[in-house]
């Protein structure tokens, strides 16, 4: 989360080229949307017992259990030629990139339409319980959940692509209690890459094919680069925020303001 925000801030400040990043989580964690209250929507005691970290995202949306997955993040200026200026347009382009990448894996995905399903109130805090418009479905089941943040002419969108999904563990940390009905509902709502392809692939190979999907849809060459010195410095400062319970639990504001380049 600190790296995502550091890249986002530096892109806004220095008008950098778009960045696409893929990463995983260790140990397992639950990320919560910017506006969520984990004291009401998570089983914090169970998270602590299982060694599952809790971190608040800069983006909105609902709770996501991060375990065996690939998280992608895209950072760019609003109006950058590769992406439409509006939120839904940006979502769709990024989803098209992911659809193409999944196709290279042999996974046929499509975009969800608006209001295609009624939200289950018992599972309302769980991101994968229902798709939003332009999110990815495989055979009607959600395989990727995404959220976006915009400020000062830039956007950050990140999302989770499931490799496998442990329904029992996910519900045990997201819900105060769960029933067999909850488990069945969530299991029937979720798809995972290594469960829908004939032969599971190494994570690095999956990332390479997803990257190819972005390159082909956007018509660009993607060049691998390390973090800049400015991003590293900012990431180190932001780590204090993302390790702080006042941010993760209470959403206390951090002291590093967003700013444009002068």
Map each language-model feature to its residues.
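Short connector loops at helix/strand junctions that flank enzyme active sites
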Residues: 25-27, 49, 65-69, 131, ...
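Well-ordered beta-strand positions
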Residues: 23-24, 64-65, 137, 162
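A glycine-rich, hydrophobic loop/mini-helix early in the fold
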Residues: 44-83, 209
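Short glycine-rich loop/turn motifs that provide flexible caps or phosphate-binding loops at active sites
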Residues: 32, 50, 59-60, 139, ...
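Active-site loop/lid in soluble adenylation, ligation, and acyl-transfer enzymes
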Residues: 1-45, 49, 53-57, 127, ...
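Short, electropositive, low-hydrophobicity segments enriched in small/polar residues
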Residues: 37, 64-65, 149
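Extended cationic-aromatic binding surfaces that line active-site or macromolecule-binding grooves
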Residues: 25-38, 71-78, 96-100
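Catalytic beta-strand/loop module used to bind and position nucleotide/cofactor moieties
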Residues: 78, 82-213, 245, 249-262
């Amino acid at each position: 989360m600190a790296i995502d925000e550091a890249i986002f801030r530096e892109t806004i400040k220095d008008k950098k080229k778009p960045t696409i990043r893929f990463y995983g989580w260790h140990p397992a964690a639950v990320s919560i949307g910017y506006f969520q209250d984990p004291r009401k929507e998570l089983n914090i005691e169970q998270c602590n017992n299982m060694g599952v970290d809790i971190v608040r995202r800069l983006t909105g949306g609902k709770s996501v259990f991060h375990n065996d997955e690939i998280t992608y993040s895209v950072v760019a200026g609003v109006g950058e030629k590769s992406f439409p200026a509006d939120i839904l347009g940006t979502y769709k382009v990024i989803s098209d990139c992911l659809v193409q990448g999944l196709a290279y894996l042999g996974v046929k995905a499509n975009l969800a339409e608006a209001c295609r399903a009624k939200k289950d109130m018992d599972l309302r805090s769980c991101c994968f319980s229902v798709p939003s418009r332009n999110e990815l479905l495989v055979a009607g089941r959600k395989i990727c959940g995404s959220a976006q943040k915009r400020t000062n002419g830039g956007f950050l969108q990140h999302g989770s692509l499931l490799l496998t999904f442990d329904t029992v563990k996910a519900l045990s940390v997201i819900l105060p209690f769960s029933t067999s009905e909850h488990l069945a509902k969530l299991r029937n709502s979720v798809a995972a890459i290594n469960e829908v392809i004939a032969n599971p692939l190494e994570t690095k190979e999956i990332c390479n094919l997803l990257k190819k999907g972005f390159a082909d849809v956007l018509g660009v060459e993607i060049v691998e680069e390390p973090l800049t010195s400015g991003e590293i410095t900012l990431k180190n400062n932001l780590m204090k925020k993302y390790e702080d319970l006042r941010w993760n639990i209470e959403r206390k504001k951090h002291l590093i303001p967003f700013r444009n380049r002068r």
